[in-house]
């Protein structure tokens, strides 16, 4: 597996470098995803180690982190947006890229390849596809946590009104700073909102807070809290009726979740 890991890592570096361009608008998005890929790969490995997985499974987690956003590069180069609703689902696109362009998938054991595809396919969905396979669920949860933890880092510079204009086409800079009523309602209830309905900068911020309820491991949530991501997002929420109830519920949930010891059942 060590040799295969090295070949996959080298392939991914070469693949990402194909999208380097003199077009600074495109390059802004490509650069963000190149850096994000490195962070998520490292986080996935660290979380797998925290969960005391086997060396083989730690390496699988690494591979999943490495390839989880491979579809983003083709997506952004074509559509100049990371908005799946305005282009293509980037996880599904990533699986196409791996099938069409990555020559080492067949070197994985069939069960490992299925795990990889399942985790990547589900890393960006509202919920994980139902399955009785505990290993698939574990790796999907692990990858979702690793991805979310780093996306918090990515988005922090774009929270302020001044930062909005610098964001690489997440949402049009002229969009409202307020939160849409459906998102306020979901926040107050502690439920996930439909990402496809994102319309405003306020919606985008609130969705990141709602992610807290979808974090699977207390290790991840503790990292999110320790790095100040939750407090910073709350700081830059609009002064809007209905949000206080959601903030109170969120803080109570975080306190309880962070105190739970991570356990896995495979």
Regions found by a protein language model. Name each.
Residues 53-66, 110-119, 136-142:
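Alpha-helical scaffolds flanking conserved acidic
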